[in-house]
């Protein structure tokens, strides 16, 4: 039976290898592989441009350096702008909030080596989806902190929020005392009046502005952190005996 020369040197195609990495949960290897490939391509391009610059005129050297700088800057701007087109919650599920909160210093923040610029929009999308699943509870905590800070900066909004809570507690007390459950029409009318009063109170005291500012800041922090945060091993792979 005839075999091709050196059959053991057959390699797995890159798409199949990357698909296996995704299915196995080793996305940090794929992230590292993408960053390494981008760094190798950038270094080879810089070496070739420097070699060409030694044999070119000074004007050509300046133009080539300027063109390379603007091309790199444009590529980075395209990558950053692609973060705005990503739906970060497409792969998020309720189970991601049921686990333990990732440690803030070692897991969520990390060190300086834990961050790098994404080499492409595909890598940025992969990082955002995976990091949001891993740090879902951390991002939720950040939103609560930002919302509390916004309420602290806007005392009227805090008064409006507390007033709306007090209004619904009063409605619950009156409902239990006067037995609104026995009168469905009266209960619906009371709920409608309470909803209108709550909406007017929250709008008049600018609670929606505090909520919007907290959402905007927390969303920006989440997207930037998830896009620039390298994928770290969530669990160690098991080795066969």
UniProtKB/Swiss-Prot annotation:
It is found in: Endoplasmic reticulum membrane. GO terms for biological process: vesicle-mediated transport. Its main location: endoplasmic reticulum. PANTHER family: PRA1 FAMILY PROTEIN H, PRENYLATED RAB ACCEPTOR 1-RELATED. Keywords: Endoplasmic reticulum, Membrane, Transmembrane, Transmembrane helix, Transport. It comes from Arabidopsis thaliana. It is a multi-pass membrane protein. The chain crosses the membrane at residues 142-162, 189-205, 209-228. May be involved in both secretory and endocytic intracellular trafficking in the endosomal/prevacuolar compartments. Belongs to the PRA1 family. InterPro entries: Prenylated_rab_accept_PRA1 (IPR004895). GO terms for cellular component: endoplasmic reticulum; endoplasmic reticulum membrane. This is PRA1 family protein H.
